[in-house]
């Protein structure tokens, strides 16, 4: 990982500290004008703190081949492609936790960044046209899968700390996307899904399904 093992052990993601300080500064200045404006500034601080929160998560122990949700949010795609591979997409609104997690035990085989647009991440075409970062993995059994961090209408920065050659456990935090986004999973043919369209999931806790 591009960061140390203690990087994500704080209740607030460290990437959010500069934003929290700026919001706190704005709130302080607003209090100089009026209490009402100052309270609005405190709401801004609360929003930023909430966005970058890092709540503790208990990663499920089984079953073998389980796929853990890589993000908090709502399932907007859960389907089998004509090729037989299975696609799951999770949309994160600005109130969800935005840290992204590794879905399976495996080794990172590739990381690729794609520049692009910033349309609403809930649209299907966002997966192909928006700024995104693809992480490819291979399990111990040789199954390949990819997860793609997709920037959204508000999101303007994708952070990914996973590196090729690393072996990571399911539930490991590997990055985040700032202020509204989406994560796409491309899973092997024969994957059994345990979630449905519209379902709300929690990163690192909800089991999306099992690998073949």
Predicted regions and their residues:
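Contiguous, well-folded functional domains in the mature portion of proteins
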Residues: 1-212
């Amino acid at each position: 990982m591009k960061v140390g093992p203690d990087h994500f052990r704080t209740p607030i993601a460290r990437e959010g500290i500069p934003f929290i300080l700026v919001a706190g500064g704005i709130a302080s200045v607003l209090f100089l004008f009026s209490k009402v404006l100052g309270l609005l500034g405190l709401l801004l601080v609360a929003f930023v703190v909430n966005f970058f929160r890092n709540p503790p998560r208990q990663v499920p122990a089984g079953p073998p081949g389980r796929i853990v949700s890589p993000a908090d949010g709502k399932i907007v795609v859960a389907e089998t492609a004509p090729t037989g591979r299975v696609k799951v997409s999770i949309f994160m609104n600005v109130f969800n936790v935005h840290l992204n997690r590794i879905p399976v035990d495996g080794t990172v085989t590739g990381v690729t960044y794609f520049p692009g647009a910033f349309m609403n991440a809930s649209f299907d075409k966002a997966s192909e046209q928006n700024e995104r970062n693809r992480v490819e993995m291979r399990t111990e059994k040789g199954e390949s899968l990819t997860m793609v961090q997709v920037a959204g209408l508000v999101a303007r920065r994708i952070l990914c700390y996973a590196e090729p050659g690393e072996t990571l456990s399911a539930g490991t935090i590997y990055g985040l996307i700032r202020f509204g986004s989406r994560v796409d999973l491309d899973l092997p043919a024969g994957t059994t899904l345990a979630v449905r369209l519209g379902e709300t999931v929690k990163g690192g806790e909800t089991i999306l399904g099992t690998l073949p």
